[in-house]
Amino acid sequence: MFDSSFGSSKFHKLLFRFDQDIASKTRADKCPYCGGKLHVGNYLRHPRGTYGMEHEQANLRFSFCCGREGCRRRVTPPSVRFLGRKVYSGATVVLVTAMRCRDAKQALNRIKALFGVGNRTVQRWRIWWQQYFPKTIFWTIAKGYLSEPIQETSLPASLLDRFQGANLESRLFATLRFLTMLSAPYFKINHRGASPRRT
């Protein structure tokens, strides 16, 4: 299942450019809370499992801050490189957990050697994918766009298998695109039940 292209600079440049495009569109749409102008407020993250990535590709999180007085809220767009607040890169979380779903021990050991992911971490990821992810608002809505039901006990491998492509790189990219809204805090309904303004 593992493909060396996963660690290629070409693959990670593709992810970075996609995030750049999302960020540009987010800024053009203005603040989703008040409609104010957004100013660049990028910040650095230091995710693990960034094999093959250059510093900027791995660490730069595109983000904006509203310039309108009285709002000043942060707007962080969706991302294919980051999966919410998880310490490891989104690609690593998806791929390594999918390996574990298949019990492909040799492949998993190879991934662990590359990314330094311990067994306990992988087990936590499996629990998240199979017990918590299916209960998210995102999945409740997004699974309706899939042509056939996904076997949730095999997530994320079953989701990765759903997307077609010539190699693992293209299938993984399609999966990460599908999951982008998991990394968009402002998209989620807040604890008071209020949704951000959409323009």
Regions found by a protein language model. Give the residues of each.
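N-terminal juxtadomain amphipathic helix
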Residues: 15-66
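Generic structural signal for short, flexible, solvent-exposed coil/loop and linker residues
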Residues: 7, 11, 20, 53-55, ...
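General helical secondary-structure elements
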Residues: 41, 120-122, 193
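Generic preference for well-ordered secondary structure
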Residues: 2, 6, 14-18, 50, ...
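Long C-terminal interaction/binding lobes of large macromolecular proteins
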Residues: 1-12, 23, 27, 127-128, ...
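Short, positively charged, Gly/Tyr-enriched micro-motifs
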Residues: 63, 70-150
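Helix-boundary capping/turn motifs
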Residues: 3-9, 68-69, 100-101
